[in-house]
Amino acid sequence: MDGRRQHPHWAWSLLAVAVVAGGAAPTEASDNSPTSNSLEGGADTTAYWWGEWTKWTACSRSCGGGVTSQERHCLQQRRKSVPGTGNRTCVGTSKRYQLCRVQECPPDGRSFREEQCVSFNSRVYDGRAYQWKPLYPDDYVHISSKPCDLHCSTVDGQRQLTVPARDGTSCKLTDLRGVCVSGKCEPIGCDGVLFSTHTLDKCGVCQGDGSSCTHVTGNYRKGNNHLGYSLVTHIPAGARDIQIVERKKSADVLALADEAGFYFFNGNYKVDSPKNFNIAGTVVKYRRPMDVYETGIEYIVAQGPTNQGLNVMVWNQNGKSPSITFEYTLLQSPHMHHLPPVYYSFSEAASQSTESTERQELDSARLLGFMQHNGSLYRQTSSERLGLNSQLFQPPAPEVELGPSRGQESNEVCKQASGGVCEGPPRGKGFQDHNATGRAFSADKDDREISAHFTSHELLSANTISDQLLGTGSESEEFSLNETMNSIFAQGAPRSSPAESLYVDYEENEGPAAYLINGSYLELSSDRINTSSEAPFPNTSASPPNLAGNRTHKARTRPKARKQGVSPADMYRWKLSSHEPCSATCTTGVMSTYAMCVRYDGVEVDDSYCDALTRPEPVHEFCAGRECQPRWETSSWSECSRTCGEGHQFRIVRCWKMLSPGFDSSVYSDLCEATEAVRPEERKTCRNPACGPQWEMSEWSECTAKCGERSVVTRDIRCSEDEKLCDPSTKPVGEKNCTGPPCDRQWTVSDWGPCSGSCGQGRTIRHVYCKTSDGRVVPESQCQTETKPLAIHPCGDKNCPAHWLAQDWERCNTTCGRGVKKRLVLCMELANGKPQIRSGPECGLARKPPEESTCFERPCFKWYTSPWSECTKTCGVGVRMRDVKCYQGTDIVRGCDPLVKPVGRQACDLQPCPTEPPDDSCQDQPGTNCALAIKVNLCGHWYYSKACCRSCRPPHS
């Protein structure tokens, strides 16, 4: 059974269709090449014609998509040719193929490649039978790169064989999946037909034109960002062509988590190595530079489609502003192209004359239900309540607050149908993401304070909100909600008073506040905002109505200005706006002009008043700003080099320059120095409490014991000051026993390579590995050196006289400083095609190459650590620390390998602290994902410390 197939499910669900090439053009599946045999008239010639097709052969597989074939033969007959008439061979193919048994294999069965390798178990090689298993491209570097070569290995990894794979074996082409036919990887189109070249478009539609999906792009920028993890964006299930790119090189780290808060990589404040991950039903490729000096950018890409929602996170390590762009493609919902602008008006009847009825509570837990992806709303039968669905996103998002930002922030999302242009903030549609800031406005012509209570139940189309739910009348209060931190946007449209414009003022009783509503963070600020669709969205936040009574806002409605005698067609028109600022302050940018809808008197109104079909296209022009000046950029300061006494902190200082829009790169320091910019300091002194003389220890040496044997490892012990000042009774031990590795290590060899020359000069080489019983490659020191197979043999086309043959050098016998390396030098000859070892005199001892040579590794820098300090707590979980220093001789230096630096700080878990009676008033609020809040370390935030009071309590309290 082929349990390892990589074929999409849709392809196997299609019926197999036989493909036969007709006409004069032979197909790739043909296994014979027709020849032309045309004779002039009068001579005897041979006539050719096709015989009948044979029956279809048995399917090459029992499931998973095999191959069956038919053959026909070209028949011939000698006859007299007719003058002037050409006689040709059979034209076409003699063999044709089709797919068969396309149903999926049981998931717990063997793969088809495994079945083929297992079939060799009964065969004898070199006098013994082996157990064989397949090697796949992901876990072995093939001897052959042909996709239809079957690679098998013995279970112990000591032997490999390569044979042609059977027909029906899965293979992979560049942009199509395929199947092996007669040793060649033939394509299977997205229509499930063999030899078809039909491909999926970017929307995942077979032979589609790319118009059935929406391309979502956005960018994440935050000023004064808090340390720790923050949500960049939520990627819904079904997303394709995912790209998340960190545009500005920084110490930030991208991470990926599911909707429950489980991290796939770079989570829990640990950085994983860049590699490919199998996540959400697709391969996610994560790459990043290994250090700040390495070129390249950090990015996450995946082809998709995903089978679950994903949260893209960023781990901010220095509080600087990140710059991240993201994009992905989603299949369009049926309503996406036809979502009308939505206005929500509150009838005057809903507001009574008394103060108690004018003020209504805003149900913040349902506010985010205001916008739905299909533009519909929910209502309740009560005439005083407008129902809104509390589930803005599908699937539900994790309820995690990512920290308020008091500085500048802009996290924009733009959605477009394929082939369209994404320009500026979206208008008149809903655009979704998780890191959203909500805006809510309420207007009353008498400047009365007013708010609304939102609940959700019955589905109601947005087109009928005004008339069926909110009543009629020319004078009404209008409500608009814009979610703009990720540009989630619902733009109002007129119902019965199109000439009115709404402006909102805020009265501040205190500074900006924040609320968490269904997992989305809403920040409140006092910026003045109007409801025009051209209002700027980035860097702007607004507030929902007051929840605690400490904030009020007023609104005023402009009087209607309807011109008598002006026809509806002339009432509104499109007008090109003035040029927007250049998109770049330096280098070449783009300056855009957009159309805006204006009234007859020149007042800008909502775009929905004008005819969308006559809207002018945006105009884009290049604009040249000044050249970007180089600048110094610094990393964050390292920890102090010492936990006591005087030490040093270091940071990296590099010269950076914006070379082109969006391309920021490190450059030579000379450029920054030429501008006379002051270079920041790379080192500064740090002082901790004085420390007396203390013992310092290096790391343990490597155990040199052979398998199953015992030996001793050692470490250096030194006093931080004069040796006499340290207490001898507290001196740590300098050696301890160790045990060698298990005795399952064995030498494994590859096949011999080609011969490099003739007799006396030819060499053939193979690779020799030390492997465990499960096939893992380990250092050669774990295998017996005495039994290591030779990696170099003499070779040639005739017998060779004895000559010296040197093997490869072994590793240097020291990890630092000066040492010795050795190699094996043998006297060998080639006799009857086989290499033979001879005695040294036959080769001439005077000509023997050296077997030893000096070697020099990096300077002997070595890490030393002091003993652990006392735990910072007497009960519960605390922290203990130690000094970590890098020495070269007696000098403290910076040359040690940071990858093997010992930890200088670790948690210490002592006995539980005395418990107190539980506080029943401290409970978690329903609907708050407290498990996720704890996982991303948000208990210190003011909201979660209350909303997750019970979960965030210290342990044992």
Swiss-Prot record:
Q: How is it modified after translation?
A: Glycosylated. Can be O-fucosylated by POFUT2 on a serine or a threonine residue found within the consensus sequence C1-X(2)-(S/T)-C2-G of the TSP type-1 repeat domains where C1 and C2 are the first and second cysteine residue of the repeat, respectively. Fucosylated repeats can then be further glycosylated by the addition of a beta-1,3-glucose residue by the glucosyltransferase, B3GALTL. Fucosylation mediates the efficient secretion of ADAMTS family members.
Q: Where is this region: Disordered?
A: 532-568
Q: What are the annotated GO cellular component locations?
A: extracellular matrix; extracellular region
Repeat keyword on record: yes
Known InterPro entries for this protein? ADAMTS/ADAMTS-like, ADAMTS_ADAMTS-like, ADAMTS_CR_3, ADAMTS_spacer1, PLAC, TSP1_rpt, TSP1_rpt_sf
Compositionally skewed regions (Basic residues) per UniProt: 551-563
Q: Which residues form the PLAC domain?
A: 918-956
Q: Which residues form the signal peptide?
A: 1-29
Q: Where in the cell is it found?
A: Secreted
Residues bearing glycans: N87, N374, N435, N482, N518, N530, N539, N550, N737, N813
Which domain of life does this protein belong to? Eukaryota
- The intrachain disulfides are C59-C100, C63-C105, C74-C90
Here the segments flagged for biased composition (Polar residues) are 532-544
Q: Which residues form a coiled coil?
A: none
Q: Might you name a Gene Ontology BP term for this protein?
A: extracellular matrix organization
Which is one GO molecular function term here? microfibril binding
Q: What are the alphabetically sorted keywords of the record? A: Disulfide bond, Glycoprotein, Repeat, Secreted, Signal
All copies of domain TSP type-1, residue ranges? 47-106, 570-624, 628-692, 694-742, 743-801, 803-857, 859-914
Quote the subunit structure annotation.
Answer: Interacts with LTBP1.
Which protein is depicted? ADAMTS-like protein 2
